[in-house]
């Protein structure tokens, strides 16, 4: 990531990638990919029958009965969101903050993007009253809001929106005639799935919600791009599905055949892969809790992470200490922490937050070690936080944040 100076750049800003697992590829998945390496024929646009059928089963296990005629696959969720945005037309609404890859695709199409505030307790889903106010303001100014993108388990905040908030926001969006894209990329990474209620907007508003899931979250390695979309099961959904396929065809956006073979297998969730996925989530939950403790113990603010492989920290309380290091905004903070921590630390401006706010996303994957052997050991260890390489990485984080806390205390005026 580089400083986003205006000179030499267009209006589109590309943000950091999804937080990776930091773990080696499961041998079972690698075997399916290699077995399909000699397939010369291109996959169908929208996905092969095997991928589509597996996607239907994936959603049905999550309570969403799905018609194969309303499913599409693409090489990553960004391609699907680009096609959906182009097919639906109009202006786009997103929460603030939001995933770094949402807004650039609307801007690439020349579509205005409007950020809507989220409640203090969670990210990913806009406050319903702020949503209504934004929609009415945009329309009063001559805009045409048509699409709301939201997420239940959120990047960058790592939080899960409560069902009552989701209900109110979905009702508000429905009342304004918005189509919803529910990014459910992180739904399978909940730290406490038994204690966290997660409902899809598609269960509440079947005719106006398209679900998008990037398989890089829990099912495939980040370097094997594949994603699936579930369209509304009615005439409008069928028409939208057809338009999206047209756009994917124009883009040549097909899933590579070996990746498609691995995706079709992963979507069936065989026991070995399901167990590996559960162990991965448990590992990142433990590391995220330790990372959160290090951050808040130094005086920064961060919601306790509930999903994903990341947390979102507000270093506003340490602004005075950071100013002593030349840090005045989120870009400065990104560069400072990336250098000090030795791992990417994208600033909040990458996620649509105010540049002046000292916010940053911190990922857990880079804390798992520097080699495949070290990272694999994290999965099998009964005490991964005590492994030397993990302990060193967390100690570095604690040291950096503790130094900032100490600097802030030295700068406090006498009482």
Which stretches of residues belong to each language-model region?
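N-terminal small-domain helix-loop-helix segment of the aminotransferase-like
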Residues: 1-76, 83, 269, 368-371, ...
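Short beta-strand
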Residues: 11-13, 212, 254, 301-306, ...
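Conserved core of the PLP fold type I
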Residues: 39-172, 188-203, 384-386, 390-391
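PLP-dependent enzyme catalytic core of the Aspartate aminotransferase-like
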Residues: 65, 336-345, 351-415
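Helix C-cap/helix->beta junction micro-motif
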Residues: 109, 175-176, 298
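Short, flexible/disordered intra-domain loops and linkers
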Residues: 121-126, 159-160, 190-196, 239, ...
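Conserved core segment of the aminotransferase class I/II
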Residues: 211-281, 295
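Conserved glycine-rich beta-strand-loop-beta hairpin in the small C-terminal domain of fold type I
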Residues: 281-292, 296, 301-321
């Amino acid at each position: 990531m580089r400083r986003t100076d205006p000179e030499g750049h267009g209006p589109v800003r590309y943000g950091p990638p999804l937080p990776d697992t930091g773990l080696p590829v499961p041998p079972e998945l690698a075997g399916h990919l290699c077995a399909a390496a000699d397939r010369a024929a291109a996959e169908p646009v929208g996905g092969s029958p095997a991928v589509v059928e597996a996607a239907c089963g994936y959603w049905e296990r999550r309570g969403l009965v799905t018609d194969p005629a309303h499913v599409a696959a693409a090489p990553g969720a960004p391609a699907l969101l680009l096609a959906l945005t182009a097919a639906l037309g109009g202006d786009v609404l997103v929460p603030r903050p939001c995933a770094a890859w949402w807004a650039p695709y609307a801007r690439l199409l020349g579509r205005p993007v409007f950020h809507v505030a989220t409640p203090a307790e969670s990210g990913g889903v806009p406050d319903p009253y702020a949503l209504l106010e934004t929609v009415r303001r945009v329309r009063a100014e001559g805009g045409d809001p048509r699409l709301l993108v939201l997420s239940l388990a959120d990047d960058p905040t790592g939080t899960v929106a409560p069902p009552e908030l989701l209900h109110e926001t979905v009702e508000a969006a429905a009342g304004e005639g918005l189509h919803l894209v529910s990014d459910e990329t992180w739904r399978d990474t909940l730290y406490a799935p038994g204690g966290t209620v997660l409902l899809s907007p598609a269960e509440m508003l079947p005719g106006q919600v398209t679900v998008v899931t990037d398989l890089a979250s829990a099912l495939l390695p980040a370097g094997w791009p594949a994603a699936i979309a579930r369209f509304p099961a009615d005439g409008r959904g069928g028409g939208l599905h057809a338009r999206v396929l047209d756009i994917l065809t124009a883009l040549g956006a097909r899933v590579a055949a070996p990746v498609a073979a691995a995706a079709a297998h992963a979507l069936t969730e065989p026991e070995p892969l399901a167990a590996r996925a559960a162990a991965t989530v448990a590992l990142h939950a433990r590391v995220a809790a330790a990372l959160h403790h290090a951050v808040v113990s130094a005086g920064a603010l961060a919601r306790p992470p509930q999903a994903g492989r990341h947390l979102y920290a507000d270093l506003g309380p340490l602004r005075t200490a950071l100013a002593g290091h030349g840090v005045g905004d989120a870009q400065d903070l990104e560069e400072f922490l990336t250098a000090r921590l030795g791992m990417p630390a994208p600033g909040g401006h990458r996620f649509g937050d105010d540049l002046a706010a000292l916010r940053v996303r911190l990922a857990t994957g880079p804390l798992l070690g520097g080699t495949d052997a070290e990272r694999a050991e994290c999965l099998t260890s009964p005490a991964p936080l005590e492994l030397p390489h993990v302990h060193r990485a967390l100690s570095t984080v604690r040291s950096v944040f503790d130094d900032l806390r100490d600097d802030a205390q030295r700068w406090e005026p006498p009482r």
